[in-house]
């Protein structure tokens, strides 16, 4: 619930920021391709994950809305980036079946790949982080019976915390 409220707050913040940018109050920003999640960066800029076009691999990206209202691409070549969260000046991204770590200069690497997970990831969705750096990653699975929640510890160990069941499907 906290994550939902945080994302709602950030969406409102982005809307208010963009509505106040420039002298034209009706200015619309174009160019976002299937925006998914938002996170505030360490400098107050807003970062947006963009899935890109359907069925096109590696057209996903992370965009940054600077405080002056300009938009720039921070990282590109991702599959379908969804959830994003900052920790220690690094942006962590759920990208289809891997967790990606993005430096503020835009370079990125796979932080936790498919083969490291105790259950094979199907469709990573969201991500959050605890104060000790543990990343919590949801995988909606096949949207029917499966779905998982994983903990990716700073040591690199990955634990399965939850597996979907009849009561909760596709977390």
Sequence positions of predicted segments:
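Bacterial N-terminal signal peptides that target proteins for export
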Residues: 1-9
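Beta-rich, blade/repeat-based domains predominating
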Residues: 31-43, 58-59, 77-96, 116-138, ...
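Aromatic-anchored, glycine/proline-accented short structural segments
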Residues: 151-153, 157-171
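A short loop-to-beta-strand structural motif that recurs across blades of beta-propeller domains
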Residues: 59-63, 98-100, 147-151
């Amino acid at each position: 619930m906290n994550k939902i409220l945080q994302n709602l707050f950030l969406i409102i913040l982005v809307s208010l920021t963009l509505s106040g940018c420039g002298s034209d109050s009706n200015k619309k920003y174009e160019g976002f391709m299937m925006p998914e999640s938002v996170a505030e960066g360490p400098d107050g800029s807003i970062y947006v994950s963009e899935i890109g076009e359907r069925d096109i691999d590696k057209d996903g990206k992370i965009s940054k809305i600077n405080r002056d209202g300009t938009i720039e691409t921070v990282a590109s070549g991702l599959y379908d980036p969804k959830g994003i969260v900052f920790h220690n000046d690094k942006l962590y991204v759920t990208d289809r079946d891997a967790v990606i770590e993005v430096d503020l200069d835009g370079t990125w690497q796979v932080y936790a790949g498919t083969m490291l997970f105790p259950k094979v990831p199907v469709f990573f969705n969201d991500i959050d982080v605890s104060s000790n750096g543990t990343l919590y990653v949801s995988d909606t699975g096949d949207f029917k019976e499966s779905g998982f929640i994983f903990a990716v510890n700073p040591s690199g160990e990955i634990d399965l915390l939850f597996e979907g069941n009849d009561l909760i499907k596709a977390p």
